[in-house]
Amino acid sequence: MDKKIEKLCEKIGLGIAISIIIIIILFFNINEVAFGEIILYDTLPNYRINEEVKDIFNKDETIIVSNIDNSEEIGDIELIGIDDISYEHEKTDEEVKKSNEVSNSNIDIKKLENLDYLRQEFYIIDASTGMSKDYFDINKFLSADLKIEKSEDEPKVLIFHTHPHEMFKDSNTNDINEGIVGVGTKLANILEQEYGIKTLHITDSSFDMVNGSLQRNGAYERMEPTIRKVLEENPSIEMVIDLHRDGVNENTHLVETINGKPTAKLMFFNGISRIMENGKLNNISNLPNPYVETNLALSFNMQKRATEKYPGLTRKIYIKPYRYSLHLKPKTMLIEAGAQTNTKQEMYNAMEILAELINDVVFS
């Protein structure tokens, strides 16, 4: 009898042990998925976190999931904290499709108070950053003082190009004025001649060159001393525009017909000096930008005006970490007009509309 009881106990003990092992295996498998995703999300700037995992770690009013799944290099991980992360990677078709989704021209302000709805309608959020209510407050955006008095005597607007060698489909690559610099000249001329807004245009072509070779890395650092000096010498300047063109797949054409003309699409770009770490948005302490809120208010109001007036002209606002050139003045904009697959004329047509929007939002 004792032997039977002993054997029974051994079986029960073995069963309990097996059950415990199974529970442990299941526990670690589940957590490996969840925490593995968080690790990938925090480590790889473009890893899209699973929605269920997001819900575990997202308990406040912060959206930490990207609404794109792009293909930027993992090498950017090593550059976190450097103010020159390239955002001009060749975008995937899916990313371009997302950014080209047209916002509803009948804007419902009340709905935009919901952070998730605001994101869906207006923004593309890079996976290495996120949105929080303190920065993305629709009521603050709408009440922001963005107005500037016009002047034909003193410059009010500064236009420059951190990447001046960006070219277009039909550009003569040997002539700097055939690329984005020439587009900046067009914008400056329209602002002055049609709207009476004195504008200074910097055509320095050295920012993205090192020893005679094209070098985008470090362009923002090389740009800043020159532009800082210009701003010090021209204290009347209140609005700064860093004008770029995007980089997309060669089969992508960012164009919309506006006023009967083929017009390159515009995309407003914001770096918010915040990065996602361990499921939380943290300030990037060595890249301070005291003007983030005004930057965001300006791009939002430009996007809103464009959506109301010219549906389809603008892509969604692109949000990334870091600060780029956006810390130079409160009313600073980084704008990507068209891409390398657009023609010069499509770009010039876009400048007519961009100048109109600037006048509407800032100078009227």
Predicted regions and their residues:
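N-terminal, intrinsically disordered, polar/charged segments of Gram-positive cell-envelope systems
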Residues: 30-150
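Short glycine-rich His-centered loop
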Residues: 155-175
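Hydrophobic membrane-insertion alpha-helices, especially the h-region
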Residues: 13-29
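Active-site-adjacent substrate-binding region
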Residues: 290-318
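Solvent-exposed loop/turn segments at secondary-structure junctions
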Residues: 164-167, 205-209, 245-250, 272-276, ...
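A short, glycine/acidic-enriched catalytic loop
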Residues: 249-287
